[in-house]
Amino acid sequence: MTRIKRGYIARRRRTKIRLFASSFRGAHSRLTRTITQQKIRALASAYRDRGRQKRNFRQLWIARINAVIRSNNVDYSYSRFIHNLYKRQLLLNRKILAQIAILNRNCLYMISNEIIK
């Protein structure tokens, strides 16, 4: 069987990969084999970290809400606050509550005081 060099098709594939890795440092942006390895690794990391990002933001929102609620009332905590929210059927998600906690604490205090009653 004769050898096929692939010609312009291989060149087109390599340039496409090189464009992806153009911002990488050193050999990771120059050598085809290391570029392909780094591309696989970069895409795997991006996929993994998209899931982590959702987790981290949720943790941040919970920490912010908890800090503001505890500063208002020492006996009251985040878990009780969320439990009472669900009992009263107030559907506010954690992202919105965290923004209210940062931008307008008094509003969150009013919400928590209404729920406690």
From Swiss-Prot:
One annotated GO biological process: translation
GO cellular component, one term: chloroplast
Keywords: Chloroplast, Plastid, Ribonucleoprotein, Ribosomal protein, RNA-binding, rRNA-binding
Chief place where the protein resides: plastid
Compartments where located: Plastid, Chloroplast
Listed GO MF terms: rRNA binding; structural constituent of ribosome
Organism domain of life: Eukaryota
CDD domains the record matches: Ribosomal_L20
Gene3D superfamilies: 6.10.160.10, Ribosomal protein L20
InterPro entries: Ribosomal_bL20, RIBOSOMAL_L20_CS, Ribosomal_protein_bL20_C
Function: Binds directly to 23S ribosomal RNA and is necessary for the in vitro assembly process of the 50S ribosomal subunit. It is not involved in the protein synthesizing functions of that subunit.
NCBIfam families found in the cross-reference section: rplT_bact
Family as reported in the entry's similarity comment: Belongs to the bacterial ribosomal protein bL20 family.
Protein name: Large ribosomal subunit protein bL20c
Organism: Cucumis sativus
